[in-house]
Structures are given as C-alpha cells and as structure tokens.
Amino acid sequence: MSLELLSKLETKIQATLETIELLKMELEEEKQKASTLSEQNQQLTEQNQQLQQELASWNDKVTGLVGLLNSEI
C-alpha cells in the first residue's frame, strides 16, 4: 500500500472512531432521559392511583349523603 492510501485509511478510521464516541455520548444521554422519564412515569402512576382512591372515597360519601336525603324524604 502506498503512503497516500495508508493516510486516507487512517483518516477514515479516525473519523469512524470519533463518530463512535459521539454515538456513545448520545446513547448515554438517551439512557439518562429514559431513566428520568421512567421515574416520572412511576410518580404519575402513583399519583393517579391516589387520586382514583380519593375519588372513590368522595363518591362513597356523596352516595351515602344522597341515601340519607332520600330516606328522610
């Protein structure tokens, strides 16, 4: 191989290595975003469950009050 071909090959290899490093950094960023989104999803799921329980409790209270009103009428 000529020196020119070796130089071109070296340049391409270096560019490929740089691309790989950039992709690794992007992958790490995406993993962090996914982790954050997963935590937020878990928090929202828990909050949703709590709100559903509160709603059910209020519905029971309202149903009880309506029942009391109907029995007094």
Curated annotation (Swiss-Prot):
GO terms for biological process: division septum assembly; FtsZ-dependent cytokinesis. One of its GO terms (cellular component) is cytoplasm. Residues 3-67 form a coiled coil. The keyword Zinc does not apply. InterPro entries: Cell_div_ZapB. It is found in: Cytoplasm. Its main location: cytoplasm. Keywords: Cell cycle, Cell division, Coiled coil, Cytoplasm, Septation. The keyword Cytoplasm applies. HAMAP family: ZapB. Belongs to the ZapB family. Homodimer. The ends of the coiled-coil dimer bind to each other, forming polymers. Interacts with FtsZ. Non-essential, abundant cell division factor that is required for proper Z-ring formation. It is recruited early to the divisome by direct interaction with FtsZ, stimulating Z-ring assembly and thereby promoting cell division earlier in the cell cycle. Its recruitment to the Z-ring requires functional FtsA or ZipA. This is Cell division protein ZapB. The lineage of its organism: Bacteria, Pseudomonadati, Pseudomonadota, Gammaproteobacteria, Alteromonadales.
